[in-house]
């Protein structure tokens, strides 16, 4: 009988890209090299060269960074599986932070790798276009709890974008609103408030411009029901049906990432 190891997976979101990403994997594992080659072939340009050599500015373009992060995440997962030999990794549940949610769908068999790459490339382009139409910014608030950050947002007009932990919350929205929120949070005693180096107000209502385009491409892709519970960013709760997953992806464009709740759900489930 084949031995199994029960695992749960979490995958990173945008902002984790860095020039040189994936190069060690490609140099040392044929499987990783094949995965990166498939990305190049699918997208029609040398994404792998951009990942390995940059420049930074081009890799930071959201339509490039999103498929790059997905490609490296998928390569890490598949190389790990291969390295386990006769020990099969059986996923109990999977979560991903924002973009990482799409990687969860690939490794869970909900969508194909090639469709996933095309989907996140288009998602990145749509998010960029939305940022041009409705510019905004984001900031990380460290040292205030969720209720306190809600007060900051109600007083400034900013929106909560990522609840990452009890005292690390990212806000998003119109740049003037976020700037005001930064000042209010500092006055309320936040340990640190950091304006993030991003090109738009992601996970806020300013991304609504991208919704129609994302809905269209979601309808063009084949989705399967998932055998593995996918922890939804917008609720921190599991979804499995194809329809639920597509609805979650569309909702996630403008809604807050409930990362703290996602991790807590996994812990409560015995992961």
Feature map (PLM): residue ranges:
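Non-catalytic positions within long, well-ordered alpha-helices that form the structural scaffold/packing
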Residues: 186, 267-268
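FabD-like malonyl-/acyl-CoA
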Residues: 2-148, 192, 196
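Short loop/turn motifs at secondary-structure junctions
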Residues: 90, 189, 270-271
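Conserved functional loop/turn residues at catalytic and ligand-binding sites
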Residues: 98, 222, 270
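A short, well-structured juxtamembrane/interface segment
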Residues: 258-265
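Alpha/beta catalytic cores of group-transfer enzymes, especially the acyltransferase/condensing modules
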Residues: 14-16, 108-256
């Amino acid at each position: 009988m084949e031995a199994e190891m029960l695992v749960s997976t979490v995958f990173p979101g945008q902002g984790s890209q860095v020039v040189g990403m994936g190069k060690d994997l490609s140099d040392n594992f044929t499987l990783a090299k094949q995965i990166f080659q498939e990305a190049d072939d699918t997208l029609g340009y040398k994404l792998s060269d951009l990942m390995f050599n940059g420049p930074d500015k081009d890799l930071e373009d959201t339509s490039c960074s999103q498929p790059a992060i997905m490609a490296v995440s998928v390569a890490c997962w598949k190389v790990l599986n291969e390295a386990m030999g006769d020990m099969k990794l059986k996923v109990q549940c999977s979560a991903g932070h924002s973009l990482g949610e799409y990687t969860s769908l690939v490794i869970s068999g909900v969508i194909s790798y090639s469709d996933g790459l095309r989907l996140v490339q288009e998602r990145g382009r749509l998010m960029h276009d939305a940022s041009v139409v409705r510019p905004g910014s984001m900031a990380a608030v460290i040292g205030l709890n969720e209720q306190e950050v809600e007060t900051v947002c109600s007083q400034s007009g900013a929106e909560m974008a990522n609840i990452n932990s009890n005292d690390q919350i990212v806000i998003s929205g119109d740049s003037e609103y976020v700037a005001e929120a930064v000042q209010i949070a500092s006055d309320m005693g936040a340990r640190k408030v950091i304006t993030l180096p991003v090109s738009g107000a992601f996970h806020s209502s300013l991304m609504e411009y991208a919704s129609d385009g994302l809905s269209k491409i979601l309808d063009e892709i084949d989705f399967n029901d998932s055998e593995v519970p996918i922890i939804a960013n917008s609720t921190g709760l599991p979804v499995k049906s194809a329809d639920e997953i597509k609805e979650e992806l569309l909702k996630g464009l403008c809604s807050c990432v409930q990362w703290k709740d996602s991790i807590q759900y996994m812990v409560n489930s015995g992961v």
